[in-house]
């Protein structure tokens, strides 16, 4: 058996043991992570919590992400339908390997979704789970990020935010 197969078989046994203490100590279980990629989903998985954000299995290019954060209630109100498209303003020769949607004027890349129906259902369901009174924001320096965009993120009026950067 190769190493990867062994790791995959041990994960369901080892992870609950490793995560037991952090999960037990966690008091704040009703929070929403707004992020620019799949990171939020991994956090909820590690903590053994249901997804409380629509930002799972997807990513948003940095310019659109910052634009969205500047008017968050508008974009995440649930009143704007997803419009699926075939072309990206960021990816030349987009191959449509995953669903790509426009939310008003923001591109949402549903990277880990099989089709438009799945993306729409999960997006709408998770929008309803958001905890507007307990938001955390995460940004990183991928996907067309610039130093100026990182500065804009830092200047946003949200208190609980973090940037992961290698720049």
Model-derived regions: residue spans:
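Membrane-proximal basic amphipathic "stem/tether" segments
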Residues: 1-29
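Positively charged, amphipathic N-terminal segments that serve as targeting/anchoring signals
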Residues: 20-141, 145-146, 159-160
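Short, surface-exposed basic-aromatic patches at helix termini and helix-loop junctions that form
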Residues: 151-158
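A generic structural motif
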Residues: 160-167
